[in-house]
Amino acid sequence: MESLTSASSTSTLLSLRSQFSKPRTPSVGFTHRVKPKLEVRCVLEAMNNAGAAAENDKEVKLWGGRFEESVTDLVERFTESISFDKELYKQDIMGSRAHASMLAKQGLMSMSDRDSILQGLDEIERSIENGEFVWRTDREDVHMNIEAALTDKIGEPAKKLHTARSRNDQATTDFRLWCRDAIDKIVARIRHLQVSMVILALKNEGLIVPGYTHLQRAQPVLLQHLLLAYVEQLERDAGRLLDCRARQNFSPLGACALAGTGLPIDRLMTSDALGFTAPMRNSIDAVSDRDFVLELLSANSITAVHLSRLGEEWVLWASEEFGFITPSDCVSTGSSIMPQKKNPDPMELVRGKSARVIGDLVTLLTLCKGLPLAYNRDLQEDKEPAFDSVKTILGMLEVSAEFAQNITFNQERIRKALPAGHLDATTLADYLVNKVSRVF
């Protein structure tokens, strides 16, 4: 069967060859048919030449030594992360300063090269902060953008900065520094909201409100007691974040790609310079796990749930049916068609955005669940959910504090609501048990 197939193929090829090798007699319109073909071939050749020229113009990647051709534009656009990980520029420059100083101290670069690198990094940082730095997609990520810009600026000394360092340990070092800074900001916002809630409680000292279970009137409680329940929840939220900060505050630098380096580096020096507690003990663990980000996003999700419950309560209390609070105009919005409306939109959005924070956690959990050791490119996708979670929770905390500072409790309406629903039934039952020995 195989020989028949081969024979058939050979016969077909010979037939085609003889057909196209026969001299053709020009006929009417032949030149008109050939001309478009020539034009197409010229266009294709021009495109190929342009592509080759563009290929030659492309900058060689940091990893491009063994490759004979560049990635396509489509692959370059798909794999870049500079569009979002430029958020890490400050932490990346911090890490590079510490690494350069360590290399110089260990004799792996000269002091003059170190000074050139540090000066160049300072100039790049100023350029970024002034909005003058040009982020390039062809340089893939924040690390290569800064390193290539440094090479453009100071030349050969910049190429020594990557000694004893991989983007694997560099990226997770940057990310740990960023998460540490993010935790500090979130905890500060939590404290601000706690203070706002305490002030609100003090302004309404002695006010009794209906307490609810199952959204049914249950027992009378002090408003202060109710507001301080949220303060306690927020205290635990802050505690979780601080615990997370302590666990993630270890330095991955020196782990390199996954197996460390044979060069005589000083991991303790870089760890101390960056404010870490100590270097991480296992190089594979250092570059491959993102549990420190998962823990942060988990803590954010719990905080978001607490804020969502607060938002739900205040939205209910601002309704005509309850009428317990009146938000100021400065924290309310109206309707485009109903002129009487005054909506507590900020707290509705706090309630809504909690879904987004929880979704960011689920995204990262799903990303990490099937990855073999050690590093995988999938982990490039860990940044955006983390950035979004932190940005969203900061906004939720800030607007909740703003709302707390701009609401009024309608004390007369609350007092009129107290008699309904037999709120003192439990107190009466307790009295009967205590005074007349009735079983209840």
Predicted regions and their residues:
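Hydrophobic alpha-helical scaffolding
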Residues: 86-89, 110, 136, 140, ...
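Generic, well-ordered alpha-helical scaffold segments in large soluble proteins
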Residues: 99, 120-127, 149, 153, ...
